[in-house]
Amino acid sequence: MPKPYIFKSESELIDLLGNNDTLTFVQNFYSANCPTIFDVVISGVTGNTFRAFRNLPIPPSDVFRVWAIEYIEESLIELSQIDDESKYAIYVHLATLSLCECWTSLTKSEMGYGRGAKLFNLVLKKFACLTSLTKKQKQTLINLQHVPLDSYTIVGLRDIAPNLSISSNSTMNFVKTPDQYKEFQTIISNIANKAGVPAIYYDILAWDMGHR
């Protein structure tokens, strides 16, 4: 597993976010087709992600996938019609709280806000590939997507955002509260705006392209 790349400066990150290699990679990522919500969830969060959850009475992948499929199916119309940042942020926040509550009920352990948001944002990242979405809906959702915060997207900001007190081994569990989560998303969004790209491009640069 490659180590997270720590971006040397904001200007370096801006240049990388907007270069042709990144833009081509993003285009290829979102050209994938997911016919069903099941496909979105299964391809969005793979088995390796669940290794962080150990010694549970129920397989963590089962708990998450059942919850995610049900949640997305029940809120499909709402999610498909979201068209502004505030509504999208509320949707992600409420879904994360729902996941954390379900997780505690079934596993008798704490998911944690940061880990819950990361898993759900991975699903939402892939949700833009759902074939039933119109081109306009797809692009709107890509523009609104939040960055899944894990070791790659968190540690990548260590030198750019020293006020976040990121260590070299920070993981998705580093984010504890909604306010902390919002601070990360705001910093990433501001940098992405300077590059003229959606915030989710940072995740694709830090994670997907870092694992080529």
Task: Please annotate each region the language model reported.
Residues 50-104:
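A glycine-rich, hydrophobic loop/mini-helix early in the fold
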